[in-house]
Amino acid sequence: MRRCPCRGSLSEAEAGALPAEARMGLEALRGGRRRQPGLQRPGPGAGGPTGRPEGGGPRAWIEESSLHSEAERTDLEPAPCPNGPQAESCGDGHAECEAAGLVVASEKPRQNKELDGSNLQTHPRRNSPLVEMEMAGSWTDGFRTDLHRSDLQSRPKRASLCTQPGFDESWTELDRSDMWQTLPERDNKPRVDNLRTHHGVSKLQTHPVCLSPESSADNSGKELSADASRTPHDTDGFWIESQTDDSLKGPSTQTACRQPGSDGFSSKDTESALTQPGTDGLRDDSVLGESNGNDPLDLSEPGELVTNLCSHLECSSLCPVPRLIITPETPEPEAQPVGPQSRIEGGTGGFSSASSFDESEDDLVAGGGGTSDPEDRAGSKPWKKLKTVLKYSPFVVSFHKHYYPWVQLSGHAGNFQAGEDGRILKRFCQCEQRSLELLMGDPLRPFVPAYYGMVQRDGQAFNQMEDLLADFEGPSIMDCKMGSRTYLEEELVKARERPKPRKDMYEKMVAVDPGAPTPEEHAQGAITKPRYMQWRETLSSTSTLGFRIEGIKKADGTCNTNFKKTQALEQVTKVLEDFVNGDLGILRKYVARLEDLRETLENSPFFKTHEVVGSSLLFVHDHTGLAKVWMIDFGKTVALPDHQMLSHRLPWTEGNREDGYLWGLDNLICLLQGLAQS
């Protein structure tokens, strides 16, 4: 075999030992480029046709760029050689060996001494016609193409050759000259910490180059938003920088990058035109791969050519992301998906307590079917509107709510389901249906949820009502049970006639006060529902103030329903003050709304002729200053006998049907007024 041309020329005797076919091929390829005896090829700093002037003149292959494509030039150009003192002579002899088919590229390319395992070296580009031609963006032979093979053998390239030794190894680079010489190396070259790699494929791929239009004071251009994550979209191939974290969300075949010094961003696509940076337009290039999004990309100086290779191996697992359709018509458009808007579990919550005769207002749940333990559900579901905003300059794309399981502060699990178009579905109760239908024509209409009739879903009937939280952003919610009693007189009569002890009521009583049940109830291990409800009201502010706080959920997601023993005036005042975080503006709005409600109740024909038991006031406010109060839960609101009317302020005795609603409302307004004035 013939020795490597880097080690010198062969003697005539050694050359004669080669096969005739090799000699013929060697002579044919040498052509007119063979050097005269005694003459040496000029070095990188020398002038001449094969050398390069000191000032950085054009390279020898500039004239061929308009005649041959990249794939065609690979047969005429030398294979890369390692750095060393023989680099110049190797460039000539190695090309001859490769042309004769006698040299095969190594499967493991030699690592450049000036590279560490994670850096991609960049070379300065002189002020030459080549640079001007490349910056002009109109190449006669189109984009550069590289033939990636999985075996990494026989891969001649014009500029650089990057191979992947293995999945866990660093990428190496063989950077050599395009024709007969090596580019001058610099001692203090900035490294590209953000190493980018390509997966090798067995077909031609288009590899673009990114030109940095300007640099910073330390001669290094940097990509913007280096800490932003890049999110791939399945088939559209766009990268969206949400600027929220440092994670990389999976591979893609195209990358959107922002060029320094431009107001717009550069979205790279293989069929898009070039727009020069420094304008508000979009700069489009062609690229394959993606960035790891952890470190900025450093360039050594203006006008330098950088080939960015992206690694698919350092990516985190793919996460499902909605597909976006982005249109650069306006600086910050807001796109909304087609379909009805509603609520989601993490967004808003329900406003109901028990609302049927066989339900207890003490059956507390959270999360639309979760546990009744306050500790289990405290802070588990934040009360804020679900609004995912993905920002990528100059666009703002937001996604609003679709469907959500209803979240309750109190009441039985499964009472609510998500509706459509800003509505909710509450389990059907004929008493509540009749009350809501009458309230739609009563002066109380602005203080109750709108009613849209009965609907069927999955074989069950539901009352369809307005979602009262639709206009709030991250609301804080409080449920106050109004009145001096929360049970109907009919329930007492029924319990006497057909007592039905319940084990669950006994367990609830013992959980609050183990000494509350009588010895007989302890022995039986069960109590009736009216017995439990009467006992419960003696513990809370229902018996002392005419209302009690059922539950509170703050904007930060914390939930508290442990108000069973909140009875003293000072305790209730403290809870109310904490609910509004001492915001006097919110307090004044609540007071004004409650005063309007009281005036309307006193003039309402419906209210005068109905026993309102177990109903609640729903308090809602948010960070924007919006604050409202509504009457909810009419499952135990029943009509009075003919010609009977209630004052709603007198104490209750069995038979007078007084509920103490206005008595409790008067006390609540007085407490809030005191807080607002203090």
From Swiss-Prot:
Name of the gene this protein is made from: Itpkc
Pfam family, any one: IPK
Protein name: Inositol-trisphosphate 3-kinase C
Any one cellular-component term (Gene Ontology): nucleus
Activity regulation (UniProt): Activated by calcium/calmodulin. Inhibited by high concentrations of the substrate Ins(1,2,4)P3, and allosterically activated by the product Ins(1,3,4,5)P4.
Principal location listed in the UniProt entry: nucleus
Modified residues (Phosphoserine): S160, S398
Superkingdom of the organism of origin: Eukaryota
Location of this chain's protein in the cell: Nucleus; Cytoplasm
Stretches for region Disordered: 26-128, 151-300, 328-380
Biased composition range(s): Basic and acidic residues: 61-76, 107-116, 173-196, 220-236
Keywords: ATP-binding, Calmodulin-binding, Cytoplasm, Kinase, Nucleotide-binding, Nucleus, Phosphoprotein, Transferase
Region (Calmodulin-binding): 504-512
Record's catalysed reaction(s): 1D-myo-inositol 1,4,5-trisphosphate + ATP = 1D-myo-inositol 1,3,4,5-tetrakisphosphate + ADP + H(+)
Lineage summary: Eukaryota, Metazoa, Chordata, Craniata, Vertebrata
Residues where substrate binds: 481, 502-508, 529-536, 636
InterPro entries to which the protein is assigned, alphabetical: IPK (IPR005522), IPK_sf (IPR038286)
Organism of origin: Mus musculus (Mouse)
EC number: 2.7.1.127
This protein's record includes keyword Kinase: yes
Role, per record: Catalyzes the phosphorylation of 1D-myo-inositol 1,4,5-trisphosphate (InsP3) into 1D-myo-inositol 1,3,4,5-tetrakisphosphate and participates to the regulation of calcium homeostasis. Can phosphorylate inositol 2,4,5-triphosphate to inositol 2,4,5,6-tetraphosphate.
Record motif Nuclear export signal, residues: 318-326
GO molecular function terms attached to this record: ATP binding; calmodulin binding; inositol-1,4,5-trisphosphate 3-kinase activity
Annotated positions binding ATP: K426, E466, D467, L468, D479, K553, D633
